[in-house]
């Protein structure tokens, strides 16, 4: 996502501007590349170019208000109460928005003089990676801000989820940046502007999506970065973070600089960086991630993805944790087993699991509530969310810890979660929970300034102020009734922050209030399109008395809110740990629930090079097939890069529509599930950990870069052949199909040989080039698999069974018939096929040709070129023959001599 194209940033001459417009010009000068949401009463107004852009993007009216230097001022506005929806749309369109708030109410400004202007300031700059409001976020999805830095050839990717406080650092090789960013899926990525001159890195950033935000390179320099990171965390040294590298500090420094600019000095409650290396998680490049539809289907929707198929979580935090695990499968079998132990425990304790999931539904999103409170954007509902979450944790700690089964105690991962949730071990959390339970009322507003959220009886002085305020409100109701009776006009007494209390009548009914004698009582204040507003001396006096009582009550409520907010922020770390613990319990229980529903089993994950799946199924396809009422056909797959318990490379053949692509994806998905710590839909799975997963299944044109489908296919194939290791898993579908038949066959043949001989990885190679089946007899660790189909009464029936051995034909004409190709075309295709097959019959087999003979690489010289072998005696004798100068008799004698040499 990139910001909409716009002309160069416009500069403004503030000479002669009104005091309010001078404020706008000052804010615009500070943030020239952002739209300024300028608060004026109940609206956010936009002026000049901002008004034109916002009106076009949001579909709102653009008008004019006043003049500046003799020219009308373009203006557009959105109501304050609906601002989140408009902000969300602008951010999705790629705009940056600076929110300029009123820092005082008009009454306070008037105390400084009748002509004083309300103070305003930028309270935040909204960008895609810095969203925290529920209305702007997907509750079940992460929203990350990432940064990339490179130092001395080493790359680092840092990511922060501002809405939860999570921070991560990855130290990787430069060519692995794309895989890490694809796993993180950031909404916004910061990068030093000098790095964008690297075409490869720039293209990698583009492929990974999100807004790319260039930053001045100086911001990623080591010394400046270290200073900013220390300031961000409020520490004097970074030693406590475990010896961060220069690249990691540079990436974190970019994030710190961006947060300083966008959060207007407010420090978020961030956790210490979690550090990971390239060797800690399975590498999955963007193309593979897309083709396997891990968290999004090809159309961009969550529905139809692997995540959607297995997600049974009941909390927002649990949903985000599950998505993160699927995006970054682990490489350490011990860490994988720890996750699987937690899932297995809930599989074995079904009754407890069901009760736990029911209780979890009452937990709020504590992590995001805490972040908003820390940034000064939270409200009473966020305190209520903390209360509900801590109360839920307290219940779960007793429920799981007291499961009463001494023979099957909770595994280590669940024990750790329970400790984070046990109030007796977290004295501060216990105290905060007690305060919130007694202090918060039942109906909580979104904003602290709305009042009404402190429970009665908690603060006696607040109860007294409320009583006076509420008595005054009854007086207002009585005054309204009397004014209606005296005037004969159906009016209402209303209130807003600008006018205070006022009398409002519809425009059609207000005329008597302008006429004697009523005009002596009713003083005109404001005329709107459909209403007219007035005041009276009595109402103004009452307004002052109510305001004083209401102000006192609200001030006391806000003070109580600030006390609780400060207490919560001071306890940020244990609250974050408690939120993480709830998410872990939710994920483990949810995966157990899915495992039971799907008939999934616990995989065995080790450090071998094996891949042994028995009766495996594709979870997404199986769910779709079951919805249609059809059975799903499971299949086996056995690979072993060491060649001990299975083939290293399986050539997969079979008709179109027989299920080759599904079979390939199915086995890749099994690996992702297993290494993420999930059960797998199969009878059994033994998996040697996979370091990199590559998929070349389907491709499309990249017209913007002048790349055809075939070129894209070759680019992806090149990446696989240069990066796959013996511990990798590769799935390839129809390599070479986008070019001429023999070109494609030659490329497919050579790629298969390279995977077997050079990469030596586990690989599934689906193809319609049946000639590749002969590799089974020519290479040591190749097997053939075919997806079966049979003809029945002239129709083709797909069995979706993977069987040993190659397919005998592709049945392309029959598939064309099934697709609805006109019968005449099908008949003609059959006729042409018969002719081609009869003409190409030859006693010579394809694998007898030198091109397709199995390649055994010989010795290489110092330049890497093959060393030419010395000519044989037969070759030398053949080279000495003067064919043109020989008589028939001499030629016959030479032939006998050559034959004799061959026998020696």
From Swiss-Prot:
Q: Which family does the UniProt entry place this protein in?
A: Belongs to the DNA mismatch repair MutS family.
Against PANTHER family, the record matches this protein to: DNA MISMATCH REPAIR PROTEIN MSH1, MITOCHONDRIAL (PTHR11361:SF34), DNA MISMATCH REPAIR PROTEIN MUTS FAMILY MEMBER (PTHR11361)
Give the organism, scientific name: Caulobacter sp. (strain K31)
In the record, biological process GO terms are: mismatch repair
Sites where the protein binds ATP: 654-661
Recite the UniProt keywords alphabetically: ATP-binding, DNA damage, DNA repair, DNA-binding, Nucleotide-binding
Record's keyword annotation contains Zinc-finger: no
Highest taxon in the source lineage: Bacteria
Q: One GO term of the cellular component aspect?
A: cytosol
Alphabetically, the GO molecular function entries are: ATP binding; ATP-dependent DNA damage sensor activity; damaged DNA binding; mismatched DNA binding
The answer to whether the entry has keyword Disulfide bond is no
The protein here is known as: DNA mismatch repair protein MutS
Q: Which PROSITE patterns match?
A: DNA_MISMATCH_REPAIR_2
State its role.
Answer: This protein is involved in the repair of mismatches in DNA. It is possible that it carries out the mismatch recognition step. This protein has a weak ATPase activity.
């Amino acid at each position: 996502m990139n910001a909409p194209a716009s002309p160069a940033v416009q500069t403004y001459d503030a000479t002669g501007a009104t005091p309010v417009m001078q404020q706008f010009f000052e804010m615009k000068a500070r943030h020239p590349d952002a739209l300024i949401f300028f608060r004026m009463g109940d609206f956010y107004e936009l002026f000049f170019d901002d008004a034109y852009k916002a009106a076009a993007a949001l579909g709102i009216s653009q008008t004019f208000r006043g003049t500046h230097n003799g020219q009308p001022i373009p203006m557009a506005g959105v109501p304050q109460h609906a601002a989140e929806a408009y902000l969300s749309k602008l951010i999705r369109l790629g705009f940056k928005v600076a929110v300029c708030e009123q820092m005082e109410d008009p009454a306070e400004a008037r105390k400084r003089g009748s002509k004083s202007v309300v103070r305003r300031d930028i309270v935040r700059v909204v960008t895609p990676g810095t969203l925290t409001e529920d209305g702007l976020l997907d509750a079940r999805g992460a929203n990350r801000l990432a940064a990339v830095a490179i130092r001395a050839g080493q790359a680092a990717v840092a990511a922060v989820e501002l809405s939860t406080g999570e921070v991560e650092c990855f130290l990787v090789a430069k060519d692995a940046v794309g895989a890490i960013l694809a796993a993180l899926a950031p909404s916004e990525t910061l990068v030093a502007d000098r790095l964008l001159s690297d075409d490869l890195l720039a293209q990698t950033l583009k492929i990974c999506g999100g807004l790319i935000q260039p930053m001045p390179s100086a911001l990623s320099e080591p010394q400046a970065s270290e200073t900013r990171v220390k300031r961000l965390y409020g520490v004097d040294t970074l030693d406590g973070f475990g010896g961060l590298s220069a690249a990691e500090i540079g990436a974190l420094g970019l994030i710190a600089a961006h947060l300083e600019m966008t959060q207007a000095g407010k420090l978020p409650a961030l956790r210490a960086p979690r550090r990971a290396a390239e060797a800690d998680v399975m590498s999955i490049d963007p193309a593979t991630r897309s083709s396997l539809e891990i968290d999004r289907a090809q159309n961009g929707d969550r529905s139809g993805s692997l995540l959607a198929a297995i997600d049974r979580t009941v909390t927002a935090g649990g949903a985000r944790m599950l998505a993160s695990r699927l995006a970054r499968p682990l490489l350490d079998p011990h860490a994988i087993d720890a996750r699987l132990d937690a899932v297995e425990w809930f599989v074995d304790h079904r009754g407890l699991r069901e009760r736990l999931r029911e209780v979890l539904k009452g937990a709020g999103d504590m992590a995001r509530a805490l972040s908003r409170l820390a940034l000064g954007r939270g409200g009473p509902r966020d305190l209520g969310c903390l209360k509900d979450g801590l109360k839920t944790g307290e219940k779960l700690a007793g429920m799981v810890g007291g499961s009463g089964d001494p023979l099957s105690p909770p595994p280590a991962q669940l024990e750790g979660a329970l400790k984070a949730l046990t109030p007796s071990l977290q004295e501060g959390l216990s105290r905060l929970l007690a305060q919130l339970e007694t202090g918060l009322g039942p109906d909580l507003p979104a904003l602290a300034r709305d009042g009404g959220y402190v429970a009665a009886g908690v603060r006696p002085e607040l109860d007294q102020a409320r009583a006076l305020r509420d008595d005054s409100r009854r007086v207002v109701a009585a005054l309204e009734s009397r004014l209606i009776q005296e005037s004969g006009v159906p009016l209402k007494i209303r209130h807003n922050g600008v006018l205070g209390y006022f009398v409002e009548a519809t425009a059609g009914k207000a005329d008597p209030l302008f006429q004697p004698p009523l005009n002596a009582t009713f003083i005109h204040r404001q005329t709107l399109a459909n209403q007219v507003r007035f005041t009276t001396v009595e109402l103004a006096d009452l307004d002052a008395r109510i305001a004083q009582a209401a102000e006192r009550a609200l001030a006391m409520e806000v003070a109580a809110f600030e006390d609780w907010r400060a207490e919560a922020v001071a306890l940020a770390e244990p609250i974050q740990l408690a939120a993480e613990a709830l998410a872990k319990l939710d994920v483990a229980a949810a995966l157990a629930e899915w495992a039971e529903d799907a008939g999934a089993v616990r995989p065995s994950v080790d450090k071998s090079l094996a891949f042994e799946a028995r009766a495996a199924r594709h979870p997404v396809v199986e769910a779709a097939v079951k919805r249609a009422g059809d059975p799903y056909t499971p299949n086996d797959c056995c690979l072993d890069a060491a060649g001990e318990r299975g083939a290293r490379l399986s050539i997969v053949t079979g008709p179109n529509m027989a299920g080759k692509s599904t079979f390939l994806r199915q086995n890749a998905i099994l690996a992702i599930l297993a290494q993420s710590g999930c059960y797998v839909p199969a009878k059994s799975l033994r998996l040697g950990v996979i370091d990199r997963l590559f998929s070349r299944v389907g491709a499309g044109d990249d017209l913007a870069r002048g790349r055809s489908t075939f070129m894209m296919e070759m680019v992806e194939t090149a990446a696989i052949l240069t990066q796959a290791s013996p511990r990798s898993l590769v799935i390839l579908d129809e390599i070479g199909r986008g070019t001429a038949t023999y070109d494609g066959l030659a490329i497919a043949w050579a790629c298969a040989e390279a995977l077997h001989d050079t990469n030596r990885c586990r690989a599934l190679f689906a193809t319609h080039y049946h000639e590749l089946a002969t590799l089974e007899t020519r290479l040591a660790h190749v097997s053939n698999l075919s997806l079966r189909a049979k003809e029945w009464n002239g129709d083709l029936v797909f069995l979706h069974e993977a069987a040993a051995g190659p397919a005998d034909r592709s049945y392309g004409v029959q598939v064309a018939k099934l697709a609805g190709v006109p019968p005449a075309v099908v008949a003609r295709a059959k006729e042409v096929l018969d002719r081609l097959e009869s003409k190409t019959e030859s006693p010579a087999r394809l694998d007898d040709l030198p091109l397709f003979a199995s390649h055994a690489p010989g010795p290489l010289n110092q330049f890497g070129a093959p060393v030419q072998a010395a000519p044989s005696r037969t070759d030398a004798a053949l080279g000495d023959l003067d064919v043109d100068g020989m008589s028939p008799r001499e030629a016959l004698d030479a032939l006998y001599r050559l034959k004799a040499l061959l026998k020696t």
